[in-house]
């Protein structure tokens, strides 16, 4: 099994374990990132709620998640847990999130090249089934969501 599949299944496991904890506390589990890099591995959990997330919210969720992680022990390497709001450069994880932010500028990095490129920056036009539609200059790309490694909103300061 190649590393991308291992990371993907680990993320699914973490999502299934942690999202219910976040939701039970009254927050939305916006997304989870896990980067396994030896002693510097990072588990980042993004939470959101109506009206925004405060530092105290992150601390509450972090304490609960830490307890669950200590009991369940799903990560075999040493790691740092970080709980944060999605922030202005909001990461996008799900097809519903891409649909919600149609009309925004986005930056997308793919796991492997698509039509000769891995990086796309342009207008998020929306979604079509499991594809994310991005307009870069005068060309529209339909990017399969399962090829997306990382996607973020580019904030506008108009």
UniProtKB/Swiss-Prot annotation:
Q: What is its main location?
A: cytoplasm
Q: Where in the cell is it found?
A: Cytoplasm
Key word Cytoplasm present = yes
Fetch the InterPro entries from UniProt: Ribosome_maturation_RimP (IPR003728), RimP_C (IPR028998), RimP_C_sf (IPR036847), RimP_N (IPR028989), RimP_N_sf (IPR035956)
What is the recorded function of this protein according to its Swiss-Prot or TrEMBL entry?
Required for maturation of 30S ribosomal subunits.
How is this protein named in the record? Ribosome maturation factor RimP
Annotated keywords:
Cytoplasm, Ribosome biogenesis
**One Gene Ontology cellular component:** cytosol
Q: Name one Pfam family in it.
A: DUF150_C
Determine if Endoplasmic reticulum is one of this entry's keywords.
no
Q: Which family does it belong to?
A: Belongs to the RimP family.
Q: Which domain of life is it from?
A: Bacteria
Species of origin reads: Pseudomonas fluorescens (strain SBW25)
Q: Which BP terms does GO give this entry?
A: ribosomal small subunit assembly; translation
Q: Would you indicate the residue range of the signal peptide?
A: none
């Amino acid at each position: 099994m190649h590393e991308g599949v291992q990371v993907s299944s680990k993320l699914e496991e973490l999502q299934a374990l942690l999202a219910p904890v976040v939701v039970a506390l009254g927050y939305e589990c916006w997304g989870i990132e896990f980067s396994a890099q030896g002693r510097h591995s990072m588990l980042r959990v993004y939470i959101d709620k109506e009206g925004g997330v405060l530092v105290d919210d992150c601390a509450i969720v972090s304490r609960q998640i830490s307890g669950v992680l200590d009991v369940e022990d799903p990560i075999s390497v040493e790691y740092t847990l970080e709980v944060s709001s999605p922030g202005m450069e909001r990461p996008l994880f799900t097809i519903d999130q891409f649909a919600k932010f149609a009309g925004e500028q986005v930056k997308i990095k793919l796991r492997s090249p698509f039509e000769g490129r891995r990086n796309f920056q342009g207008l998020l036009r929306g979604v079509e089934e499991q594809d994310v539609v991005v307009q870069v200059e005068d060309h529209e790309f339909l990017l399969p969501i399962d090829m997306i490694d990382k996607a973020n909103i580019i904030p506008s300061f108009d």
